[in-house]
Curated annotation (Swiss-Prot):
GO CC, one annotated term: cytosol
Catalytic activity: alpha-D-galactose + ATP = alpha-D-galactose 1-phosphate + ADP + H(+)
Listed name of the protein: Galactokinase
Gene: galK
Catalytic residue list: 175
Main localization, broad class: cytoplasm
Length: 389
C-alpha cells in the first residue's frame, strides 16, 4: 500500500482543498491463455497488488481537473464536461475522459465536475494494463460519486468501449474484466465469448508470482497483433467450410488435427493451432490448480511460452532470454511471456526463498546478453477496483 497520507498532502498542495475520497484500481497479469481472447477462448488473469490510486474531490461547476504524479511535466489538465473530445495534448487524460464520455453516451448523468490526483505504481508500457487500470478506476469513481448503481460487469464493458471507440485501440475485454472483477488470492477463468466466469483459488504455498519486465521499447506490438488476428480469422473461415463452428476456441486438439489440412497456408495453420491448443492448456491449468498441482500448472505455463514462441511467433529475443534463464533457475516451476508480446513482461512462479538469487542471476545474464537491465516485481493477487477511503 502506498502512503496515502503523502498523496493526500500532494492533493491539497495541487488543488488548495482536501480530497474527499480515495480509490484503488489494480493492474493485472494473465497467468495463462494468451492470444486466445479474440479467438473465442478462455483466459486466466488475476488482479495485482500494484495499481493506480486516485484521490477525488467534487466541484460545483462543469470542469474536470486531473493530475498524474507519473506525468508531472504535464501539470494539471483541465477539460469541460460540455466538450468531451479526444485531444492529443491531453495525453494520458484521454483515458479517464473517454470513460466519462462513454458513461454519458449510455445515458448516465454526470451533473458536475471534479478534481482527481492519480498515482500509479504499474510501470507504463509493461503490459500490466496501466491504461485499463485507469479506465476502471474512473468508472468506479463516477459510479460512487453520482450514485449511479451500475454493476461492475457493466462498468467493465463501458471501459472496454471507451478504449475501442474513444482511444481507438481494438482491445478485448480481458484487461478491464480482470481489474474490475479481481478477487484476493483468486484468478478468474473467463470465457471471452460469453463473459461466463469463475474464480479459482490459488494456493501459492511457499511460492510467489514474480513479474520480469524486459524494458524493451514496444513498437511492434500493435501492428503484429492485428496481423495475428487476421491470420486466425482467415484460418477460421477455411475451417468453417467443413465444420460448423463460430470460433477457434470451440475446437478440441483432436478436432483441430482432423481439419487443419483445410487451412491452405501453413503459417496460418500454426497460428490457429496455438489458439486451439492454448485454450485447452488454459482449461487443464485451471484443473491442475483445483487439484493443488502447482507443478503441472507451471509445466503448462512453460508449454504456453513454447507455443507463443514457435507457433504464434510473438516473443522475440528479450522475452525468450528472460524465460529461458528462468527455466534454468532454481526454485522456478513455471515461466512464460504474458501480454501481447514483442516486449513487455514475463510471469514466473518462484519459490519464496529462491527469489533473491533468481532476480540476481537473471538480471546479470539478461543484461550481458541484451545490453540493458530488466526490472522485477514480486506481486500478490488483489481484489478488484474499489473505494479505500
Amino acid at each position: 500500500m502506498e502512503n496515502i497520507n503523502v498523496l493526500k498532502s500532494d492533493f491539497t498542495k495541487l488543488f488548495a482543498k482536501d480530497a474527499e475520497s480515495v480509490f484503488f484500481s489494480p493492474g493485472r497479469v494473465n497467468l495463462i491463455g494468451e492470444h486466445t481472447d479474440y479467438n473465442g477462448g478462455n483466459v486466466f488473469p488475476c488482479a495485482l497488488t500494484i495499481g493506480t490510486y486516485a484521490l477525488v474531490r467534487q466541484r460545483e461547476d462543469k470542469n474536470v481537473l486531473v493530475n498524474s504524479l507519473n506525468f508531472k511535466e504535464l501539470g494539471i489538465l483541465e477539460f469541460s464536461l460540455e466538450n468531451m473530445i479526444y485531444e492529443k495534448q491531453h495525453d494520458w487524460a484521454n483515458y479517464p475522459k473517454g470513460v466519462i464520455k462513454t458513461f454519458e453516451n449510455h445515458g448516465y448523468n454526470i451533473p458536475n465536475g471534479f478534481e482527481i490526483l492519480f498515482y500509479g505504481n504499474i510501470p507504463n508500457g509493461s503490459g500490466l494494463s496501466s491504461s485499463a487500470s485507469i479506465e476502471v478506476l474512473m468508472g468506479t469513481i463516477l459510479n460512487d460519486l453520482f450514485n449511479l448503481n451500475i454493476n461492475m460487469v457493466d462498468i467493465v464493458k463501458m471501459c472496454q468501449e471507451a478504449e475501442n471507440k474513444f482511444i481507438g485501440v481494438n482491445c478485448g475485454i480481458m484487461d478491464q474484466f480482470a481489474i474490475g472483477m479481481g478477487k484476493e488470492n483468486c484468478a478468474i477463468l473467463l470465457d471471452c465469448n460469453t463473459l461466463k466466469y469463475s474464480y479459482s483459488t490459488i494456493a501459492m504455498d511457499g511460492y510467489k508470482i514474480v513479474i520480469a519486465n524486459t524494458n524493451k521499447k514496444r513498437g511492434l506490438a500493435d501492428s503484429k497483433y492485428n496481423e495475428r488476428r487476421s491470420e486466425c480469422e482467415t484460418a477460421l473461415a477455411e475451417i468453417q467450410k467443413v465444420k460448423n463452428i463460430n470460433a477457434l476456441g470451440e475446437l478440441t486438439e483432436e478436432e483441430f488435427e482432423e481439419v487443419k489440412s483445410c487451412i491452405s497456408d501453413p503459417i496460418k495453420a500454426k497460428r490457429a493451432k496455438h489458439a486451439v491448443y492454448e485454450n485447452r492448456r488454459t482449461l487443464k491449468a485451471v484443473k491442475a490448480l483445483e487439484e493443488n498441482d502447482l507443478t503441472l500448472f507451471g509445466k503448462l505455463m512453460n508449454d504456453s511460452h513454447i507455443s507463443l514462441r514457435d507457433d504464434y511467433e510473438v516473443t522475440g529475443i528479450e522475452l525468450d532470454t528472460l524465460v529461458s534463464l528462468a527455466w534454468k533457475s532454481e526454485g522456478v516451476i513455471g515461466a512464460r511471456m504474458t501480454g501481447a508480446g514483442f516486449g513487455g513482461c514475463t510471469v514466473n512462479i518462484v519459490k519464496e526463498d529462491c527469489i533473491d538469487s533468481f532476480v540476481e542471476k537473471v538480471k546479470a545474464e539478461y543484461t550481458s546478453k541484451i545490453g540493458y537491465e530488466p526490472s522485477f516485481y514480486v506481486v500478490s493477487i488483489s481484489d478488484g477496483t474499489r473505494k479505500i477511503g
